[in-house]
């Protein structure tokens, strides 16, 4: 892809993506064993996170990474846009797509328990291009709720697509 097309695509995406609702949703089933294994693999020893199922454990805060990454790689491929009368994907070259960061907000959220089914939906926030590299960056604003429609977490995930990939 030549520089002019990359620049044209960047301008298009910076105009179209902000505040756009991302189609679809991502679901994650929270299983006791996976929650405990996740906590143990990062060295957590607090019984609140690794105790028996009968003790009523909750997911450790780091467990948010597991559902955030699933949401990222489930939702982004579903983004379809109409550019110059042609339908296109957000990431034209999926191997140039990169998950860059997460910022978690647990304010007014309930803890995750074994058996919960998490549902993530998102919109795009700010979108910009690093001029020198022509790498496109975007904020993906995720809202994650459980099966009871209770807020579990709000996440700002970073999306980057290398030049030629968008």
Residue ranges and their predicted role:
Residues 1-101, 166:
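Hot-dog-fold acyl-thioester-processing enzymes
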């Amino acid at each position: 892809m030549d520089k002019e097309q990359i620049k044209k695509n960047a301008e298009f995406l910076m105009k179209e993506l902000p505040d756009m609702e991302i189609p679809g949703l991502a679901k994650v089933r929270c299983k006791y064993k996976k929650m405990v294994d996740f906590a143990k693999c990062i060295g957590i020893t607090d019984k609140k996170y690794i105790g028996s199922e009968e003790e009523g454990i909750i997911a450790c805060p780091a467990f948010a990474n597991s559902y955030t990454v699933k949401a990222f790689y489930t939702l982004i491929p579903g983004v379809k846009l109409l550019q110059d009368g042609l339908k296109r994907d957000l990431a034209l070259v999926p191997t140039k797509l990169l998950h860059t960061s997460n910022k978690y907000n647990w304010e007014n959220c309930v803890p995750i328990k074994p058996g919960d089914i998490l549902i993530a939906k998102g919109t795009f926030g700010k979108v910009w291009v690093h001029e020198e590299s022509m790498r496109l960056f975007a904020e993906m604003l995720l809202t994650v709720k459980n099966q009871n429609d209770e807020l579990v977490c709000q996440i700002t995930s970073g999306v980057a697509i290398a030049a030629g990939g968008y």
